[in-house]
A protein has these predicted regions:
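Bacterial Sec-dependent N-terminal signal peptides
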Residues: 1-27
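N-terminal amphipathic/hydrophobic interface segments
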Residues: 18-504
Length: 504
């Protein structure tokens, strides 16, 4: 593509350098002829006029040949044979034998060059550069494709259209609209350098710099790249997209958006395969979910999305260094999996969930959602819940498993199941009316239930099956009883904003 552009430029420069080089006179034959009485240097020719000049043969009904200027003016049924493959048809012509420039007019001037055709009302053809020009609408065809523009050029030496102003390239499968286009007919590739839209039955491609292979339907975009495909959008700096396979690779500022499900997956590199119903993004990858007016940001080293046969979101998977931010809850883990069918988000390998002033950890955490928000949270194996109540004092609940129940997105109560342990501080109203720590309940039991008030604070703890409980004044609680085994306080790693999901 670049080589052909250089060739066009060199041919143009050669044309400038060689203007006026030819002094060979035009030769002609005709059925009848006479000198113009007012201009004896001009011959008026009639009937079967044939003129030749340096490899070109011209046919016309009549003509005027100016021997002083070495120019030829022809009329009606004009045929110009420029080479074995290149022919021009028209109704009126002026040819300068010194500059080798043809100007030809007709209701429709037709240039045929092998399988390429150019039509216009007026063409200027420079023989030195093998280039035809038009400046008032032209219509080209090459194979099964048509090219239309207000102005343009066609180079018959290298078989290239250069067209601009209201450009349209189309065939039975697509329509390309732009302002400036170079179309190399040998490889059927369109090269564009301005805002370009490519429409087809299945997709829309937008680019401001790139190439489009009209035969294979493969697009290469290097600036402001955008593809839309049935509710699926891709934006990036650089994009390679195969329309037939519905497969794309994107580089730089990548955004893959599922408009049907209101999900955007972003990163620095991504791939999407619509026929196989998956996409993935890596390098600063993150997903934005918009639901019920709130947004959830999920980051992982690599994020995968899949859809079902009805183009509905099926799964989201994030691997390594996963963090999640939502206004009312945050999380961290090694990997995460979201099943859209069941609305379940599962966090694996050392997961942490923060909800308001609570921190929950477990081997695996499942968050079940409905239209109102979180419905139930399962803390599977090694459940541990912590709430900070003072600078160095924490409410703690620990057990084999835990379940937190919600209603309308608000927490109701939580069950700590099997081997439940507790450190729970008692508060009372202080002299200034603010809560004051007065004691601590410490104990173990088979199961425990914690109830939450309207402010989401733990208001009551119920123990079952003959628990072993002790109450201490706050200042007398032994140091070794203030922390349950495996205590961790991870507030420093909690994401406080969407940007924090990238901090590990």
């Amino acid at each position: 593509m670049k080589t052909k552009g250089v060739i066009i430029l060199l041919l143009s420069l050669m044309g400038v350098a060689t203007v006026g080089r030819s002094q060979k006179l035009i030769e002609y034959t005709s059925g009848m002829g006479s000198r113009n009485p007012q201009r004896p240097a001009v011959w008026i020719l009639y009937q079967d006029v044939v003129a030749t000049h340096e490899g070109m043969t011209l046919y016309a009904d009549s003509a005027h040949y100016d021997t002083e200027r070495n120019s030829f003016t022809a009329f009606r049924d004009i045929v110009i044979k420029l080479s074995d493959t290149t022919t021009i048809y028209g109704d009126q012509l002026y040819y300068d034998g010194n500059t080798r420039v043809i100007d030809i007019w007709a209701d429709t001037v037709v240039l045929i060059d092998g399988g390429n055709v150019l039509k216009a009302n007026h063409l200027t053809y420079e023989r030195n550069t093998s280039t035809a020009y038009y400046d008032e609408w032209g219509h080209g065809t090459s194979a099964d494709r048509t090219l239309d523009s207000r102005k343009g050029q066609y180079n018959s030496a290298i078989k290239v259209f250069y067209i601009y102003d209201d450009v349209q390239l189309s065939d039975s499968t697509m329509r390309l609209v732009t302002d400036t286009l170079v179309y190399t007919t040998d490889d059927q590739i369109a090269h564009f350098r301005s805002a370009t839209h490519i429409y087809s039955d299945s997709s829309l491609i937008y680019s401001e710099l790139g190439d489009y292979n009209t035969d294979t339907r493969f697009a290469s975009s290097y600036h402001a790249s955008h593809v839309e495909n049935q509710g699926h959008m891709i934006d990036s700096d650089t994009l390679y997209y195969d329309e037939v396979a519905e497969y794309g690779k994107a580089y730089g500022n990548v955004k893959i958006k599922d408009t049907d499900n209101d999900i955007t997956c972003s990163g620095r590199y991504g791939e999407t395969h619509r026929k196989l119903r998956y996409s993935y993004v890596t390098d600063s990858a993150h997903v934005l979910f918009v639901d019920a007016g709130d947004s959830l940001f999920l980051h992982g080293d690599t994020v995968y999305l899949t859809t079902d046969t009805a183009n509905r979101l099926s799964t989201v998977r994030a691997n390594y260094h996963v963090k999640v931010y939502r206004r009312d809850a945050q999380a961290m883990c090694d990997s995460a999996f979201y099943n859209a069918t069941d609305s379940i988000l599962t966090l694996y390998k050392d997961p942490v969930v923060w909800y308001e002033h609570y921190q929950c950890t477990s081997d695996t955490i499942e968050l079940h959602h409905d239209t109102s928000g979180v419905k139930i949270v399962y803390l599977r194996t090694n459940c541990y819940a912590v709430e900070q109540v003072d600078l160095n004092k924490f409410n703690q609940l620990k057990g084999r498993q835990g379940v937190v129940y919600f209603r309308g997105g608000e927490p109701l109560y939580a069950d700590i199941l099997s081997n439940a342990q507790m450190v729970y501080y008692i508060t009372d109203e202080g002299p200034d009316g603010s809560p004051q720590l007065v004691g601590a309940n410490v104990g173990v039991g088979t199961d425990m239930r914690i109830y939450f008030d309207t402010t989401h604070a733990a208001s009551r703890v119920v123990t079952y099956d003959k628990p072993d409980m002790q109450t201490y004044p706050v200042m007398e609680l032994p140091q070794d009883m203030q922390r349950l085994p495996d205590f961790r306080w991870l507030a420093a790693r909690r994401p406080r904003s969407p940007e924090d999901v990238f901090k590990w």
